[in-house]
Amino acid sequence: PAAPEIYNDLGFTPHVDGEPFNTYRGLVMAGYQGWFGAPGDGCPHSDHSNTAWYHYRENDRFEPGVLRNSIDFWPDMSEYETQYTPGKFILPNGEKATVFSSYDESTVMLHFKWMKDYGLDGVFMQRFVGEVINNPDGKAHFNKVLASAMKASNQYQRAICVMYDL
């Protein structure tokens, strides 16, 4: 009988830091959306009350008591250079809670730094057709995030591939 096909065999040479990526074979990749936004981050989304807390809010609201805010857990903000305060959210220690904006280049740079620090080779930069077609604010947001990701991927030598969710 034919030999069974082997999956997940490490028959590849691991990537060497400082060398360009010539294949994705054997790399540890993640998906990266970069879809969070906040008032004051400079994105056109923040000019509109219903999209100011982009992707944090549910039904145009991001506030305590809303049953379905669209984050699963609060981010650890201790390493973020720029932080945004969404109103009345209070941490257990009594401090006002803060969040990040993916539109802010320093956020994307930090995420790519973490990828390098923790051995993640790179990302599939996920872009959503519905967010960029006939949507100038969405296109501006995601083009800025992509530009920041390209800069960060070069600085931290992480692989990057653009993929579209159709």
Give the predicted meaning of each segment.
Residues 1-166:
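Glycan-processing catalytic domains of CAZymes
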